[in-house]
Design a protein with these regions (language model features):
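Catalytic-site neighborhood detector that most strongly recognizes the C-terminal catalytic loop/helix
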Residues: 69-71, 97, 189-215
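Short, basic (Lys/Arg/His-rich) helix/loop patches that form interaction surfaces
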Residues: 2-31, 41, 90, 106-116, ...
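Short, polar N-cap/turn motifs at the start of nucleic acid-interacting alpha helices
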Residues: 55-62, 180-200
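C-terminal secondary-structure termini that scaffold catalytic or DNA-interacting sites
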Residues: 2-25, 60, 73-87, 91-96, ...
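Key DNA-contact positions within bacterial/archaeal DNA-binding proteins
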Residues: 46, 136, 195
Length: 224
């Protein structure tokens, strides 16, 4: 998973730069796909875990969000989203469709090997026996990947221990930094109002506004 560099603020209020890095060594393929889908769609963890293969439109490179996983009384449950705007369709790059197809084939082969012991319901992200991936797994996998990346690197070159939700924040920040309109970003995130997006990503909008100012300066300076 490669991510271009832009600055954002993590959940502790500490600013950091999303550098140009890779974290793929010794990682399960479905975890790689999970991380990529989180970055390229901005879906919440619960929305990702609730995805079934029927939610993927391979022809048009789209993912349909219609449910989410959460913890209720200590139990992992899948239910409808809290708001109408959480029901949405989000596009992703074509290379990711190919990765998803390969993962689907691998899981079908595993299902055949398990036979009657398979307990899955067509979930995309699964445990060994086909059951839905545990709610804690995405966070644990990301922390493990960050730790392995940081091993042997000096502090200034290390990645911060961001939560899994940080991938969603990174997705939005990169879109805003690339001058995507706030309505599009808000729709992809499933926010009820654009004001929610603007409040959460004020730091990225300020950076984007500064870049716009610099562009105007360079354009008008040529006319002076």
């Amino acid at each position: 998973m490669r991510v271009g560099g832009h600055t954002r603020v993590d959940d502790t209020g500490i600013a950091y730069t999303v550098g140009d890095y890779e974290i793929t060594r010794e990682m399960q393929e479905q975890i790689k796909v999970l991380f990529n889908l989180a970055i390229y769609t901005g879906l919440r963890k619960g929305e990702l875990l609730a995805l079934k293969w029927s939610d993927i439109d391979f022809k048009n490179d789209l993912v349909r969000v219609s449910k989410a996983v959460t913890i209720v009384d200590g139990e992992q449950v899948c239910k409808a989203p809290k708001t109408k705007t959480s029901y949405r369709t989000v596009s992703f790059p074509h290379f990711l469709a190919n990765r998803l197809k390969a993962l689907q084939i691998a899981e079908l082969e595993r299902r055949f090997q398990f036979g009657k012991d398979w307990q899955g319901e067509d979930w995309i992200f699964i445990q060994d026996n086909g059951r839905m991936m545990s709610y804690s797994t995405p966070y644990e996998a990301l922390q493990d990947a960050i730790k392995r990346y940081n091993d042997g690197r000096k502090p200034s070159d290390q990645l911060p221990a961001i939560p899994f939700h940080g991938l969603r924040h990174t997705s939005a920040t990169l879109l805003i930094a690339s001058q995507q309109d706030i309505k599009t970003v808000s729709n992809r995130l499933g926010h009820a109002q654009t004001s929610t997006t603007m409040n959460i990503y004020a730091h990225a909008l300020q950076e984007s506004d500064r870049k716009a100012s610099d562009v105007l300066e360079s354009l008008l300076a040529k006319e002076a």
